[in-house]
UniProtKB/Swiss-Prot annotation:
Belongs to the NAGSA dehydrogenase family. Type 1 subfamily. Pathway: Amino-acid biosynthesis; L-arginine biosynthesis; N(2)-acetyl-L-ornithine from L-glutamate: step 3/4. One of its GO terms (biological process) is L-arginine biosynthetic process. Keywords: Amino-acid biosynthesis, Arginine biosynthesis, Cytoplasm, NADP, Oxidoreductase. PANTHER family: N-ACETYL-GAMMA-GLUTAMYL-PHOSPHATE REDUCTASE, CHLOROPLASTIC-RELATED (PTHR32338:SF10), N-ACETYL-GAMMA-GLUTAMYL-PHOSPHATE REDUCTASE, CHLOROPLASTIC-RELATED-RELATED (PTHR32338). HAMAP family: ArgC_type1. It is found in: Cytoplasm. The keyword Ion transport does not apply. GO terms for molecular function: N-acetyl-gamma-glutamyl-phosphate reductase activity; NAD binding; NADP+ binding. Gene3D superfamilies: Dihydrodipicolinate Reductase, domain 2, NAD(P)-binding Rossmann-like Domain. The active site is at residue 147. GO terms for cellular component: cytoplasm. This is N-acetyl-gamma-glutamyl-phosphate reductase.
Amino acid sequence: MKKYKAGIINVTGYAGLELARILESHPSVELCSVTGRSLAGKKLSDVFPYLHRLDLPITENLEGQVDVAFLALPHKEGAALVPALLEKGMRVIDISADFRLKDPALYQAWYGFEHPCPGLLEEAVYGLPELKRKDIAGARLVANPGCYPTSAILGLVPAFKSDLIEPSAIIDAKSGLSGSGRTPTVKTIFCEADEDVCAYSIGTHRHQPEIAQELCRASGGVIPRVTFCPHLVPMSRGILSTAYARLKQPVTDEEVKEIYRQFYKDEPFVKVTAEPPHTRYTRGTNMCFIYPVVDALNEQLIVISCIDNLVKGAAGQAVQNMNIMLGLAETEGLEAMATLP
């Protein structure tokens, strides 16, 4: 059986390493090339012993035949590489934010750089399979969604599409420390992060325009007001988002739950739960657990959603997108359930 060839540009970050872990056991795809400038010349399994079956050399550039290239570089660093990869006939999945926003001006405003290839922004497909499956299937370039937006959008989009709520939402999200990457900072070292919870980038987080853009599309072009407040919590993985939105008209708790169940009934990686979910339910999996509830006294909808920020929020969703692009079963390589404890 022919296997597709995959390559990872910048395997050494958390998202790149998680991609390597998932792809190693993928039945239809072979990970054949990985890059990492600071570790070029070393073997992946030597530097990261937990990836003991991956004896791949880490190189400066992708080598050999590659059908699908995953970019796991920080924002701004990978965008300029994409045209050359596409010219070589590769399908490209970018895990950074470089192709998520459609308006080039937003990159200057929110990310502080002028986009090097704005002509590709319209072509790039926003890779949230639950909303864009058909577009992803025919795409050359997929912009993998951010971790916070994945959790927030999946939690709110059924309510927006069903016209249940006013075009406004408050999103309170809490993330494990891996969401800040592998490079240590004062905020993320153990002595500072342990037994501590803090809010950050209040009203200025770069995922805010991404959430607003996709909720606008889901609501038929109505631009929503999105208030987004992220927090760091002392755990390694996981995001739990709690979204609040005003109901347009009275609706029962069961009616809302049924709307959500019907919306996601055919989705392999979204489960509407009977009780508020825990982040540990998603650890190491590509699942998103969602719990909608009506606050009847205040005429509010409250939606809790949680994901593993490195899997459904990054590498797992990227593999899900790859499966769709290659015409494979969407769940291939992503069937793992969480571990407990």
